[in-house]
Amino acid sequence: MQNLYSEDDTRVKFIDAKLYDSSWNEENIKRNYYFTDGRKLLGGKRAQRKFADYLLRYEGNNLAIIEAKKFSKDPLDGLSQGIEYAKILNVPFVYSSNGEKIYEYDIRNHSGKYIDKFPSPKELFDRIYGNVKEWQYKLLTQNVMYIPQKELRYYQKIAIDKVIEAIINNKNRILLTLATGTGKTTIAFNLCYRLLEARWNKENKDQKPKILFLCDRVSLRDQALGEFNPIESDCKAISAEEIKKNDGKIITNANIFFGIYQSLAANSKEQENIQEEQESKFYLQYPKDFFDLIIIDECHRGGANEEGSWRAVLEYFSYATQLGLTATPKKEENIDTYEYFGESVYDYSLKSGIEDGFLTPYKVKLIKTTLSDGYTYNPDDLIQGELEKGFYKQSEFERNIFLPNYNDFIAKKILELINPMDKTIIFCVNQAHANEVKRAIDKYKSVKRDDYCVRVTSDEGKIGLDYLKLFQDNDKSYPVILTSSKMLTTGVDAKNVRNIVLLANIGSMVEFKQIIGRGTRVYEGKDFFTILDFVGATKLFYDPKWDGEKIEELKEQDEKEKITKEHIKQTKEESKEKKSVTIHLKGTKLKVLDITTTYVGAQGKPLSTKEFLEFLIGKLGEYYDDEAKLREIWSDQKNRERFLKALANDGVDENALKDLREIFSKRL
């Protein structure tokens, strides 16, 4: 009789009944809780989504998951998967049940036991959080705002919960590290909403808190304001315009204030313009204990060292709890950020985002040309200016050595490698180089429109920002290609970017991740994006914990990265001293020597073509022992489709599956 009960029968007849007996109601039970979207595959397909059979919740808090097995199975059969999912979802308890027996596993102390009945929601909540004060309970049980079609992703909820836990534990400096494109502003909005609704503040008064949201650019501040639109009545921008409206007095009649920190520390190199310098000084007019919480967006950019842009702001408002948001993991060049805030309370990596299907996977085309390493003096070339015989490194290009022919050659190659209407961002050495590349693109473009390729740099001002808005609008086809230098490394929310082109040496892991983040956002019909690397930057900046394991030739990355940063710094200093030289290539031949395509595997690991084939062969070996077994699988249509689906879930894309079909059809 027991064998007649399927897993669904077991859930309905036995597990649900036991939950009801322990005071669990439908509001607290989520069945078949899917928490990932499944890695994006070619052809608009996705790998299998991860889900828990049951998620148990109470007062907005995820407390436990249940893995259900059919009545005739051993309840422990589902435990390992349950533990894996519970760790991902940050829930402390796992239950595995066949309807008759219940096994409870406590992840916090790595121990388990059989129990007679499920604990009630309140019992489980108290076991996790213990005795909490009234204000702490309010914070823990305050839900986020319900917005239809915008339910929080699992990692966004965890990030918010981790910050709430840190606040409850009186931690004054908090850091969140989440990859670009994962919705840090969404997290900030929902966190602020919970704090406002729970009426949390540093003095435990019955009033809403005062929160300052800091950005380093006016455009990013305005973008954040847009995200907070559902509670716009609580929000105000600290700006010259708003203060002018307020008869020259600082704005105090709000709960969430948005501003920029760009030049408070008088770091003139980081000032975008005089307006931003003036706006940032308005902070000094607020009392030091005015704010309860300060959120610093992209905190790796301002710098936590004593001369950093936001350091002075935070020291002035040291009374406030301070939350830093960053997209970059701990590395040498942003160590000050981590020393200031401490270790991140929660990390969500690019690798995880791609595996879960919330970020778009990518492939890299490393293009090696005759000038990839540098230029060797050739008397047959037309040289304008003084140039000694010798070898000049590629990092000197467009600083004091100008090669118009080479820019033409690169532009032509870019247009050959991309689809003409695929949105593309080209990162150049500087603003002048961005202008030169635009000129070269215009020379060879097949689409004859003035706005097909545009330059977006700080020199372009409002015109450039208007072009950027059009580029980010998914309903607009033009502009298609943007050329820029540093301006577009952050703050570009363009979901349909298909190509990132690297024409400039990159000096740090932080900058590299910011640039790559321009392409990772998910968009309908976008199965992957492509990095076209003309300078070898992708060889230097793979990060095993963040992006996946290193391939063999990248193992000297740390030393190379250090050398690269030092070399770029040295090159910039030398360029200031040297006179510029323009070289019209007459004798030097321009050609592509090699294009190496690197795939990114299901686990985020970068794979060369050879390694990708080895990966396929290895995957095949997991499903059959010999050729006879493969013939047996392939001869049955249902088995064949199951086999191909299993391969797809392991990250084998449709093109590879098509090749496999052809190979098998000929061979079998």
Give the predicted meaning of each segment:
Residues 26-31, 232-246, 445-462:
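Conserved RecA-like helicase motor-core motifs
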